[in-house]
Amino acid sequence: METHVSLEGTVQGKAATLRLVGQTLEVILNKKETWLQVPVELVLDVSWKSPHLLISLLAPKRHSEHASRILTRDQWAQRHANKHVASLSLFQFRAHTYDGSSWANTVMTKAYDRTPARRRVLVICNPSSGKGHAKHVLEDLTKPIFQAARFELDVVETTARGDAFRFCTTLDVSRYDIMAFVGGDGTLHEAINGLASRNDAVRALSIPLVPIPAGSGNGLYVSLHGAEIGFSAPVACLTAIKGVPYSHELMAVTQPLDAFGSSGRWPYTLRKTTKDGRGYVQFYSFMSQAIGIMADIDIGTEAWRFIGDIRFTLGYVFAVLRNKACPIHVDAYFGASGTASHASMYECARQTPVRVLQRNGQLQHSSAILHHEQMQPHTHMGTTKDLPSDVHRLRFGTVLDELPMSPTPFDPTSASHPPSDVWTRIHTAVSTVYTGKVPYVARSLLAFPYTC
């Protein structure tokens, strides 16, 4: 049965009716003017202390507090492609009433029907990320929203490369329900590798991780929320507050230890040795891996951070004009012809935002998104029993190990399909290799549309 509860009072000195109609919160002034109408999912907190009712929520931004704020359920249902959602900002108002306790409890129950309210969040901020606006995103957007939702909030700011990694290696993860990251994808990358390097990596990696966009590309954020709504910190905070976790596979990357020189410049890796004593480093990637042009675009445009994500487009143009060859061997493992069609791959990718934690036997981390599942307070996702005891074990060994290779290299210009179920060397000139696990690596680059 659809919920329909009303409360009479005054708002901004006008007679007001506050209504919860199904999944929509409304405020009607003078019995005729719809001053506020938003999906109940946008409600952060409702508290009553006679005679005042304080309501905190996200609503479309307006220049005047007297202007109406309306976001329909249809607009919210299409939020991944609706620019109206990009205008959401924190909005708080008071209603004067003498009997608001029951109404407040009803709205809060509806607003948090999938996740507990008032949980504990750790925010890690990298002030140097992107254009350098992360501090503003933290102080003016992130903190006020979490505080309005009455979350227990701790904040850590990084000051140097590797800080997020080092902090996460010793973090007491049991103190938090969620970790949020104000910065770019690199900040989250450091944190994941810090959590993965711990003795309790399986448990540490079960805490939900949420990106709050303040970097250059913000690929994970865009992949989760869509490119249309831009870099919306309020939407990201809402995800942290009300999102239900889903699993996201991590990719293991290995490189010879001597590739980094004697200084050991790479701070966040697992350093190990092969059976014959050769050293290598192992780390984890959640988004993309690049060699050649695509790597040069990222690393080679570090000095252009101040121009935002357009730095990648300019870097690509210059790299293509140079067309520098990449002297590497590429070995690939192909499935059988017809294993997956474009249609099935697209459907799998389309369902990514509604996957919950179901995969077994893999090292994985979680990124919170909105999903219709129930989550208990102060608990992580309980997957440790399904993961192997050696979470860092590699199925095909390291970059230093020999692979079971097909005797015949594959020429991609030929009409034949490559051999299946065996490693095959690709015989062609290469300028770049680019692989990934999320669709977008930046707003303007849908690099991997069929990832899932």
Where on the chain are the PLM-derived regions?
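Surface-exposed, flexible loop/turn segments at secondary-structure boundaries
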Residues: 129-130, 161-163, 187, 217, ...
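Non-catalytic interaction/regulatory modules that flank or connect domains
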Residues: 58, 424-434, 441-452
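ATP/NTP phosphate-donor binding region
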Residues: 1-182, 189, 193-203
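Conserved residues at beta->alpha junctions
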Residues: 182-183, 288
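Active-site glycine-centered loops adjacent to acidic/histidine catalytic or metal-binding residues
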Residues: 126, 185, 213-215
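Short glycine-/acidic-enriched loop or helix-start segments at secondary-structure transitions
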Residues: 190-192, 221-222, 444-445
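Catalytic core of DAGKc-family lipid kinases
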Residues: 158, 173, 195-438
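Short, acidic Gly/Pro/Ser/Thr-rich loop/turn segments
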Residues: 62, 130-131, 292-296, 439-443
